[in-house]
């Protein structure tokens, strides 16, 4: 168990997907919003295929609106919050009820606010945190870059949507491989990662 935690290996029965605050009011202000939501929707489809638990939050929905329909989360419970962190008492209780839970796969907005606060709280609780970089964004690409760097410094694993789904499958003989393969057959839309990763010193060991 300790070696799995140290290297950040994902398992479908020990992981949960977090989708953070993909709401209507952010549509016009978040850089690459359509692409981020599209990638997060892929993650949600994959989680459903693999029968993984999913947590979806809405930050002050009275002011920021509902979750956008293109995420494909109709019928799923939405946890309302006002804290930046997704780790509210209700959600923490939910996590504690899941046997053998080790890894949280994290997507959403904004990277420097709710995503980073959530990641740091989860790391502090001893969970492995996998930040899906192509499914997280901010109003500012500078904030996005430094938040990703900060989370990595604190012990989170930066990854991509396709990387996560393939690691969760683990084997082409997995009974759900063909179904998940259809989700990732086309490359994920460009969410601007290459343009912000031009500061290699931020990500040096």
From Swiss-Prot:
It comes from the Eukaryota. It holds the Pfam family Isochorismatase. InterPro entries: Isochorismatase-like_dom, Isochorismatase-like_sf, Isochorismatase_domain. Belongs to the isochorismatase family. PANTHER family: HYDROLASE, ISOCHORISMATASE DOMAIN-CONTAINING PROTEIN 2. This is Isochorismatase domain-containing protein 2. It comes from Xenopus tropicalis (Western clawed frog).
């Amino acid at each position: 168990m300790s070696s799995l935690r140290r290297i950040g290996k994902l398992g479908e029965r020990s992981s949960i997907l977090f989708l953070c605050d993909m709401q209507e009011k952010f549509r016009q202000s978040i850089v690459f919003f359509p692409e981020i939501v599209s990638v997060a929707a892929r993650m949600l489809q994959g989680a459903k295929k693999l029968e993984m638990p999913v947590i979806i939050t809405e930050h002050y929905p009275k002011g920021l609106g509902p979750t956008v329909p293109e995420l494909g989360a109709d019928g799923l419970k939405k946890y309302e919050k006002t804290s930046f962190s997704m780790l509210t008492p209700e959600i923490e209780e939910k996590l504690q009820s899941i046997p053998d839970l080790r890894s949280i796969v994290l997507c959403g907005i904004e990277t420097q606010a709710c995503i980073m606060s959530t990641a740091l709280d989860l790391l502090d609780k001893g969970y492995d945190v996998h930040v899906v970089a192509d499914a997280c964004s901010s109003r500012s690409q500078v904030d996005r870059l430094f938040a990703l760097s900060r989370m990595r410094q604190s012990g989170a694993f930066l990854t991509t949507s396709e990387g996560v789904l393939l690691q969760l499958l683990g084997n082409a003989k997995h009974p759900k491989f063909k179904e998940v393969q259809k989700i990732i057959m086309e490359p994920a839309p460009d969410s601007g990662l290459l343009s912000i990763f031009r500061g290699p010193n931020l990500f040096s060991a």
